[in-house]
Amino acid sequence: MSKKPWAGRFTQPTDAFVEAFTASIDFDQRLYRYDIQGSMAHARMLSRQGIITGAEAQTIISGLESILADIEKGDFEFSVALEDIHMNIEARLIERIGSVGGKLHTARSRNDQVALDIRLYLRDEVKEVRSFLEKVQESLLEQAERNLGVIMPGYTHLQTAQPILFSHHMMAYYEMFRRDSWRMADIYKRINLLPLGAGALAGTTFPIDREYVAEQLGFDGVTRNSLDSVSDRDFALEFCSAASVVMMHLSRLSEELILWSSADFHFIDLSDAFCTGSSIMPQKKNPDVPELVRGKTGRVYGNLMSLLTVMKALPLAYNKDMQEDKEPLFDTIDTVKGSLKIFADMIAQMSIRADNMREAAARGFSTATDVADYVVRKGIPFRDAHEIVGKTVRYCIEHDKQIEELTLEEFKAFSEHIDSDIYDFITLEASVDSRRATGGTAREAVAREIGRARQERLQRM
């Protein structure tokens, strides 16, 4: 066998810099297990179809098993001269078992081989990402259960809006990560199709059985067009897109944790295990983990744009540009998994300052909407009620009062429809618990959602 699998057509050796520039072994070596797994299934199929003998297939499989063991033990030296993981393994196989190893590549191209490897790899990674999402959801759910009844300010425009339960806030993020898990499950369906058998681009002249290989490798089916099979990276783009949404959710939560842990809010305390100090200011406790996750979100967005840009103008079928699919994909996987793992632990160990949350909720006229709703129930159109309460708030600001501190006489100065029962509607508890409809912040509504989430999780176990 020539050193290069394609060297027969060439009269000059590859320039050393070109060799290094075009090699992908430095990053695609992480696919070794999947490359060997796919090759074993391919060898079994070749034997089953009579394309190679059973003895040859067994020799190939035994050789691949020994190579896998070498790599796992760290006894395999990867070569840049052999370009990629596929040729590194094939060259070692031929070196180990002789020319029969060269029969493995019958009815196969590196184009459909790499498409298979990435799908096998990404299939496992999607499962792992979903398991990390489950852990983040569990941490959020435990915080919601543990702190049911704790009232905090809800915000719009980062201005105090209405009182809500802290548990309601945690369950909002639970829903976000729940959708993320659904997206990953949906993407898995499109990943889990076998591209092997497409050859370089047009299929193969050998009587292969793609469905048998798909069954061997646990795929739901086979891809339907050979050109598309080797040129498709939609599944990787979809993963990077869904991963970007995961990171966006983590980044939003990071921003809130950073604010909440500051001295100005002091709603939460992050465990010391997830914070660092300052080299000059001894009092500092910096929320480095959420800050880094917020920063890494941009990195994952960049990976998505990188992959989209690689694919945007490629004619069918395979092009060398597509070698650039792996680094953004691999980096996205590593970043998302790391971020989810650390967040699950950080949220679980976070402690709540319930008194500070309640105190903040009592400021900023958070029950003003409840006053407006009260006036509406007295028969006043909402827009008129809105103006009445707006004037009431302005009066409170001018006289340095909270709404609940107004006397009945002061209330009546703005509307004769306000009676002494107004005070039953403008406590923080009354405001929160009046929002009982599904999805609302009332304790009974939030408790229902926590229970539903618990039931769903039990059913998935």
From Swiss-Prot:
It catalyses: 2-(N(omega)-L-arginino)succinate = fumarate + L-arginine. This is Argininosuccinate lyase. Belongs to the lyase 1 family. Argininosuccinate lyase subfamily. Pathway: Amino-acid biosynthesis; L-arginine biosynthesis; L-arginine from L-ornithine and carbamoyl phosphate: step 3/3. Pfam families: ASL_C2 (PF14698), Lyase_1 (PF00206). Disulfide bonds: none annotated. Transmembrane segments: none annotated. SUPFAM superfamilies: L-aspartase-like (SSF48557). It is found in: Cytoplasm. The keyword Cytoplasm applies. GO terms for cellular component: cytosol. GO terms for molecular function: argininosuccinate lyase activity. Keywords: Amino-acid biosynthesis, Arginine biosynthesis, Cytoplasm, Lyase. Its EC number is 4.3.2.1. GO terms for biological process: arginine biosynthetic process via ornithine; L-arginine biosynthetic process. It comes from Syntrophotalea carbinolica (strain DSM 2380 / NBRC 103641 / GraBd1) (Pelobacter carbinolicus). It is an enzyme of class 4 (lyase).
